[in-house]
Curated annotation (Swiss-Prot):
Example of a GO biological process term: positive regulation of flagellated sperm motility
The protein, known as: Substance-P receptor
Disulphide-bonded residues: C106-C181
Lipid-modified residues, S-palmitoyl cysteine kind: C323
Length: 408
């Protein structure tokens, strides 16, 4: 897979070499240049502004610095980078049909944007796995801030390794209509095994595998949060936390589905192009259309966050409070409350739930001891320190010492 417009120029190069000429077949008329200029400019502006605001909302507010949001910062940075370093260059390349930037940037242009695509999808995968551990296995250790940063570094390292062949084999070829940046694979045109193997490998690692992992994780999460009945304490606060947890999962499912839809035509196109080269007249317009769809994935996430998350919405309203038709509302929603207050409130709520559970357990044991002596089971939701629902887990009614340990 190639992340830039050099794919169309690969076909132009191969065709012109076979015909013994050096004429660029993909010169565009002015009206097409104008349309693509507007289309790609929208992506760049919305993506850069939106993702920078997302990073600011999370980094500048302590209340937003959670494991999931750290990965969202990484995702926003990857998408902003892809928009800045890839979309802008493709825009100018499509207008002038000439590579002005030399061999070094040709290699970087093929290498870094693909690294960003890898990082984007694996950041989503990390978020899905973190949500899975938090909700399905709440008693297991969670990622710390340091561990999260290490995972992010591992994701980028893996992304750089996977994108290395694109940077290594990128080359500049002089043509009469202008230089082109293309991938000069070591095998011949008749035997394109290197390219074909790489395309299939990338398709599996950047699309199929992570989406399978994400799909399985959110399936189990959905079964826990929606399919399971929530017994026990029916306080408003308790159910508000469950609803909040569901909203986060819904938001991330929308983000992943958007990414999958935007990038599917792009991956299919490159697989087909690898197996059968296309040099038809409509090739360039078709390529630019699916490239625009793929690149547009970088601008949707900030919009999704703003629509589906209250805190992100507050942050966006605060940034655009200068607009006459936007009411900023209460900016304090992003600020951190007193840590002592939050801990006290959480502890009191947890103690109340523990006392209710223990009382219910003892009463149940007294009633059933005369009949069969069997211990009953009940479903309870373990709560995190901030009051959010962690998971539905089974606890034996006769293990009252478990609750005592948690209380301590």
């Amino acid at each position: 897979m190639n992340s830039n417009i050099s794919a169309q120029n690969d076909s132009a190069l191969n065709s012109t070499i076979q015909n013994g000429t050096k004429i660029n077949q993909f010169i565009q008329p002015p009206w097409q240049i104008a349309l693509w200029s507007v289309a790609y400019s929208i992506i760049v502006i919305v993506s850069l502004v939106g993702n920078i605001i997302v990073m600011w909302i999370i980094i500048a507010h302590k209340r937003m610095r959670t494991v999931t949001n750290y990965f969202l910062v990484n995702l926003a940075f990857a998408e902003a980078s892809m928009s800045a370093f890839n979309t802008v260059i493709n825009f100018t390349y499509a207008i002038h049909n000439h590579w002005y930037y030399g061999l070094i940037y040709c290699k970087f242009h093929n290498f870094f944007p693909i690294s960003a695509v890898f990082t984007s999808i694996y950041s989503m995968t990390a978020i899905a796995l973190d949500r899975y551990m938090a909700i399905i296995h709440p008693l297991k250790p969670r990622l710390s801030a340091t561990a999260t940063k290490i995972v992010i570094c591992v994701i980028w390292s893996f992304s750089f390794c996977m994108a290395f062949p694109l940077g290594y084999y990128a080359d500049v070829y002089p043509m009469e209509g202008g230089d082109i940046c293309y991938l000069n694979w070591p095998d011949s045109e008749e035997n394109r095994k290197y390219e074909q193997v790489y395309q299939v490998l990338v398709f599996c690692l950047i699309y199929i595998l992570p989406l399978l992992v994400i799909g399985c994780a959110y399936t189990f999460i959905g079964m826990t949060l929606w399919a399971s009945e929530i017994p026990g304490d029916s306080s408003d606060r308790y159910h508000e936390q469950v609803v909040a947890k569901r909203k986060v999962v819904k938001m991330m499912i929308v983000v992943v589905c958007t990414f999958a839809i935007c990038w599917l035509p792009f991956h299919i196109f490159f697989l087909l192009q690898t197996l059968h080269e296309m040099t038809q007249k409509f090739y360039q317009q078709f390529y630019l259309a699916i490239m625009w769809l793929a690149m547009s994935s970088t601008m949707y996430n900030p919009i999704i966050y703003c629509c589906l998350n209250d805190r992100f919405r507050i942050g966006f309203k605060h940034v655009f409070r200068w607009c006459p038709f936007i009411r900023a509302g209460e900016y304090e929603g992003l600020e951190l409350k007193s840590t002592r207050y939050l801990q006290t409130q959480s502890s009191m709520y947890k103690i109340s739930r523990i006392e209710t559970t223990v009382s219910s357990v003892l009463n149940t044991n007294d009633e059933e001891a005369e009949e069969n002596g069997k211990s009953s089971k009940r479903l309870s939701l373990d709560l995190t320190s901030n009051g959010s629902s962690r998971s539905v887990c089974k606890t034996m009614s006769d293990s009252s010492s478990f609750y005592s340990n948690n209380l301590a």
